[in-house]
Amino acid sequence: MKAVLILSGGMDSTTLLYDLIDQGYEVSAITFDYHQKHKKEIACAQKTCAKLSIPHKIVNLSVLNDLAPSSLTRADRDVPEGHYAEESMKQTVVPNRNMVFLSLAASYAIGIGAGHLFYAAHAGDHAIYPDCRPVFVSAMSTAFHLCDWNDLVLQVPYLMLSKGDIAKKGIGLGVDYANTWSCYKGKERSCGKCGACTERLEAFREAGAADPLEYEP
């Protein structure tokens, strides 16, 4: 079965890549460079795909920095610190980002004859990111049935899982989490304070494992 995966280089999508390979999918990965501060995730995605011999496209979407400003992309906006579920984390929303990503990934999937499109939204995303909610996934799934004569199935298997659940699954699959990136601040080492870092650290604690990344003191 041919499938396309939106691969950021973070924990969730990297785990899903290993998961799909384990299930026997013939996976092609697509990564989007939208001028995010945390570009290290792109390098992680490249390294993972090279290691696993996965076809990998990187698409330049730096225009989102102009059209859809966010603290994830703008130098004049600080990435908020605190828990992932805090209201301040809404500053990290890139307006309509996943709809743009999914639309382009759908074109790629249809173009290469893949019948399945995957992305790794999970339960912890629902409160902050509108384009990770079940209702959004349902609407996009309907759109993909209508957008082309070739039927494309949108699959979001981690939609109701916590990040801790995903970490446990990934550890069982042998995911190399040292080659993933979560921190939104884009520094040499993870900050340990932004929402992405706090959720990642919680996930490893829940999974009973140590995070292999180094954090700022």
Swiss-Prot record:
Gene: queC
Name of the protein described by the UniProt record: 7-cyano-7-deazaguanine synthase
Note on cofactor: Binds 1 zinc ion per subunit.
Organism of origin: Methanoregula boonei (strain DSM 21154 / JCM 14090 / 6A8)
GO molecular function, one term: zinc ion binding
Pfam families: QueC
Protein residues bound to Zn(2+): C183, C191, C194, C197
CDD domains: QueC-like
SUPFAM superfamilies in the record: Adenine nucleotide alpha hydrolases-like (SSF52402)
Phylogenetic lineage: Archaea, Methanobacteriati, Methanobacteriota, Stenosarchaea group, Methanomicrobia
